[in-house]
UniProtKB/Swiss-Prot annotation:
Disulfide bonds: none
PANTHER family listed in its UniProt record: GLUCOSE INHIBITED DIVISION PROTEIN A (PTHR11806), METHYLENETETRAHYDROFOLATE--TRNA-(URACIL-5-)-METHYLTRANSFERASE TRMFO (PTHR11806:SF2)
Location relative to the cell: Cytoplasm
Gene: trmFO
UniProt KW keywords: Cytoplasm, FAD, Flavoprotein, Methyltransferase, NAD, NADP, Transferase, tRNA processing
Single biological process term from Gene Ontology: tRNA wobble uridine modification
Identification of the protein by name: Methylenetetrahydrofolate--tRNA-(uracil-5-)-methyltransferase TrmFO
Organism, scientific name: Staphylococcus aureus (strain MRSA252)
Length: 435
């Protein structure tokens, strides 16, 4: 009898898991509640919709997520394939046209002979092999089911999405095109600020009104997607070392470094929309408008989508999951995506890739798949299943700190990262022979 796998959730992780299974001849029910039931953050019924940003972050092998992407590329990831096809200019980063990206994935999966798409809300975990990839906005009913099978309380924190603006409404006389340190093509519009302009902006941010938070949800922020107003509360200089840092962004008109810089990144292939980099926010919409208009060049800007903030849900993975993203107590159930404690689009997709490949091998009798720790994929899987501080487990991005140390110590950070990246890809190539 042919085994059919239920994959719940068609985000990046669920889409990747379904693709890896189906490409290995496994029948998949891909269950997605949208458009039958929408979430507060999604805007379409497409699979793998990008919510927080259109950037999949750095592409170079000198950063952790760049290595992760290259590993996934070599393992025929549908997410990376779609990103490469839908790429838009973004300097050294891999940014995509959201619609082209999710559209490609949606069409590929819907037309796959081994995938059946089911649009309905799931309130109970099905029998048989199941991958739960319901993401940060898991419904309350299903979240309770997960609590029941893990025996752990859910933890909540908030992801925040940055506003998107129309390029035509930007005062181009006040901004300049440049990537930090001139890396890659000049892909960012930069809004320079004097010290006086920054101080006015900063004071307005502190006075701006935030949207209310549900009383039953404790606020916890992941550093990589923290609201800029929360950063501002940490001190007047915090933003200058965060999203508004001016280093490497000298104004070509003056040759001088501004006191602060707000960067705008292209959000669509046509180049008509830009998002405000690092300005994820939970401010009320009226407050957002007032604050944004204090940024030079954006005084008369048209905001096409205001920043929003939404709950994220993840489990205490080190207590309940293994390196194959399996539930230790019920190995027929796997988790994938941000719910496992990986943080970021690419990391979420990578967890789906591991879950999908592993389950396919199990069903086909090929043995289980544990990626080497020397690979970024393997180090992420190891982190979520072995994090030392599991009493206060927090989500983690791909980074070189997760990888085992090199046998020979290299002082220069760039050279050390390059050596770790090369080792990771060598290990992956050898590991691929066993798949």
């Amino acid at each position: 009898m042919t085994q059919t796998v239920n994959v719940i959730g068609a985000g990046l992780a669920g889409s990747e898991a379904a693709y890896q299974l189906s490409e290995r001849g496994i029948k998949v029910n891909l269950i997605e509640m949208r458009p039958v039931k929408q979430t507060p953050a999604h805007h379409t019924d497409k699979f793998a919709e990008l919510v927080c940003s259109n950037s999949l972050r750095g592409n170079a092998l000198t950063n952790g997520v760049g290595v992760l992407k290259e590993e996934m590329r070599r393992l025929n990831s549908i997410i990376i394939e779609a990103a490469d096809k839908a790429r838009v200019p973004a300097g050294g980063a891999l940014a995509v046209d959201r619609h082209d990206f999710s559209g490609y994935i949606t069409e590929t999966l819907k037309n796959h002979e081994n995938i059946t798409v089911i649009n309905e809300e799931i309130n109970a975990i099905p029998d048989g092999y199941t991958i739960i990839a319901t993401g940060p906005l898991t419904t309350e009913t299903l979240a309770q089911e997960i609590v029941d099978i893990t025996g752990k309380d859910q933890l909540y924190f908030y992801d925040a999405a940055a506003p998107i603006i129309e390029k035509e409404s930007i005062d181009m006389d006040k901004v300049y095109l440049k990537s930090r340190y001139d890396k890659g093509e000049a892909a960012y519009l930069n809004c320079p600020m004097t010290e006086d302009e920054f101080n006015r902006f900063y004071d307005a941010v502190l006075e701006a009104e935030a949207a209310p938070v549900n009383s039953f949800e404790k606020e916890k922020y992941f550093e990589g997607c923290m609201p800029f107003e929360v950063m501002a509360e940490r001190g007047r200089k915090t933003l200058l070392f965060g999203p508004m840092k001016p280093v490497g962004l000298e104004d070509p008109k003056t040759g001088k470094r501004p006191y602060a810089v707000v960067q705008l990144r292209q959000d669509d292939a046509a180049g008509t929309l830009y998002n405000i980099v690092g300005f994820q926010t939970h401010l009320k919409w009226g407050a957002q408008k007032e604050v944004i208009k204090l940024i030079p060049g954006l005084e008369n800007v048209d905001i096409v989508r205001y920043g929003v903030m939404h709950r994220n849900t993840f489990i205490n993975s080190p207590d309940v999951l293994n390196e194959k993203y399996e539930l230790i107590s019920q190995p027929n159930i796997q988790f994938a995506g941000q719910m496992t404690g990986v943080e970021g689009y690419v990391e979420s997709a990578a967890s789906g890739l591991v879950a999908g490949i592993n389950l396919a091998h199990k069903i086909l009798g090929k043995g289980e798949v544990v990626f080497p720790r020397e690979t970024m994929i393997g180090s992420m899987a190891y982190y979520i299943s072995h994090a030392k501080n599991n009493k206060n487990f927090q989500p983690m991005n791909a980074n070189f700190g997760l990888l085992p140390s090199l046998e020979t110590r290299i002082k220069d950070k760039k050279e050390r990262y390059e050596a770790q990246a090369n080792r990771a890809l060598d290990y992956l190539e050898n590991f691929k022979k066993t798949l």
